[in-house]
């Protein structure tokens, strides 16, 4: 990314949020836009695809506190001063040459380098001078997938189709034409920086000969024009482990955006959304369900067959069970990450018949009389009696 692009891109506007937006607001805005603009939801729509890429790029920066801080500092530092096209320019910090990519100054950001102070410290030899050019690791990428309740509980392998910067398939990320190789820059000897003195200060600045990369490509790849990166659509197979919960993020190392000229790729983060189930609920590793029973079954007791994630199991309802009681079946819940499984929690709920035939009504009347004769009072001890 050129210095002007870095400064002029408004990631906040891209997501439709203010510059003071919280992480939750940023995440909510991104999720809505990503769902609306995803290539799978807009097949053949190139405008939606480009917008999806821009939204993903904005989220990758603003969702990372360190990257967001550096982005804000960069815009404050350069945007307000009418910066010259070539960089800091006359009167600035050493007059960088025209065409230098400010992304090379901030190239270590995705790899977890420090903030703007570290960068300026390097320019003015504060805390030591860089001796080697760090590879520019690719940016992290975020995407989402929705699973069924049982898929999330038991684990599943899903294909994810996504469009992002990836290593060039022609040069395999080197940036050089097949059959050739980049050569070490003779000016900086591969360090990517050159040093000079001005008065009492020693300066380190990106090398003009190699644009701070440490190497020179004499014969660039015709497909990626020397960057080593191409935008392409790919399908990644993602293994979702058993027991994943709604909103959980899964990291796939090295599956994010490709690094510059063969540098390491970023990571892919997949946020999992879990659909509700008609039968089951979940409480941590425990599986929950509500079991309809009759009054007679609660009073007399019974055994009822109920579903689990891997078949059915008989649940014994003891005689005299109260409505709303929860019965526990150990080890028949959601698989745990370290092995074993949670429990199945079965809550009994009495189902009141809406219509009874004459025989049933007569039997129920006889039961009511017998209940009174036994001295049973359902409201005994009730505070409202």
UniProtKB/Swiss-Prot annotation:
Its cofactor is Zn(2+). It holds the Pfam family DnaJ_CXXCXGXG. InterPro entries: DnaJ (IPR012724), DnaJ_C (IPR002939), DnaJ_domain (IPR001623), DnaJ_domain_CS (IPR018253), HSP40/DnaJ_pept-bd (IPR008971), HSP_DnaJ_Cys-rich_dom (IPR001305), HSP_DnaJ_Cys-rich_dom_sf (IPR036410), J_dom_sf (IPR036869). A zinc finger (CR-type) spans 155-233. It is found in: Cytoplasm. CXXCXGXG motif repeats lie at residues 168-175, 185-192, 207-214, 221-228. PROSITE patterns: DNAJ_1, DNAJ_2, ZF_CR. Binds 2 Zn(2+) ions per monomer. CDD domains: DnaJ, DnaJ_C, DnaJ_zf. Zn(2+) 2 binds at residues 185, 188, 207, 210. It comes from the Bacteria. PANTHER family: CHAPERONE PROTEIN DNAJ 1 (PTHR43096:SF54), DNAJ HOMOLOG 1, MITOCHONDRIAL-RELATED (PTHR43096). HAMAP family: DnaJ (MF_01152). Belongs to the DnaJ family. Homodimer. This is Chaperone protein DnaJ 2. It comes from Nocardia farcinica (strain IFM 10152).
């Amino acid at each position: 990314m050129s210095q002007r692009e870095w400064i002029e891109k408004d990631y906040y506007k891209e997501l439709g949020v203010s510059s003071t937006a919280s992480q939750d607001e940023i995440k909510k805005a991104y999720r809505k836009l990503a769902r609306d603009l995803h290539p799978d939801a807009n097949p053949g729509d190139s405008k939606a695809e480009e917008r999806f890429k821009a939204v993903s790029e904005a989220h990758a920066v603003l969702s990372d506190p360190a990257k967001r801080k550096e982005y804000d500092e960069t815009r404050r530092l350069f945007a307000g001063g009418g910066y010259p096209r070539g960089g800091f320019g006359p009167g600035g910090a050493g007059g960088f040459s025209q065409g230098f990519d400010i992304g090379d100054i901030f190239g270590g950001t995705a790899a977890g380098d420090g903030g703007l102070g570290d960068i300026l410290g390097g320019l003015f030899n504060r805390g030591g001078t860089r001796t080697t050019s760090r590879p520019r690791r690719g940016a992290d990428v975020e995407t989402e997938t929705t699973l069924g309740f049982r898929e999330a509980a038991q684990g599943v392998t899903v294909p994810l189709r996504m469009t992002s910067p990836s290593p060039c398939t022609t040069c395999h990320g080197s940036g050089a034409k097949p059959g050739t190789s980049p050569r070490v820059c003779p000016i900086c000897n591969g360090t990517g920086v050159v040093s000079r003195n001005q008065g009492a200060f020693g300066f380190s600045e990106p090398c003009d000969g190699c644009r701070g990369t440490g190497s020179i490509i004499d014969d660039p790849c015709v497909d990626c024009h020397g960057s080593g990166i191409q935008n392409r659509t790919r399908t990644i197979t993602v293994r979702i482990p058993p027991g994943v919960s709604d909103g959980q993020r899964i990291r796939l190392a090295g599956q994010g955006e490709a690094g510059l000229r063969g540098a390491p790729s970023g990571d892919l983060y997949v946020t999992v959304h879990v659909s509700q189930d008609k039968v089951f609920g979940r409480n941590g590793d425990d599986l929950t369900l509500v079991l309809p029973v009759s009054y007679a079954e609660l009073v007399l007791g019974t055994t009822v067959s109920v579903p689990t994630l891997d078949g059915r199991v008989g649940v014994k309802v003891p005689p005299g069970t109260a409505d709303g009681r929860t019965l526990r079946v150990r080890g028949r819940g959601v698989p745990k990450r370290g092995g074993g499984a949670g429990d199945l929690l079965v809550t009994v709920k009495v189902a009141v018949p809406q219509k009874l035939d004459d025989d049933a009504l007569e039997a129920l009347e006889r039961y009511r009389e017998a209940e009174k004769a036994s001295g049973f009072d359902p409201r005994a001890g009730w505070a409202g009696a």
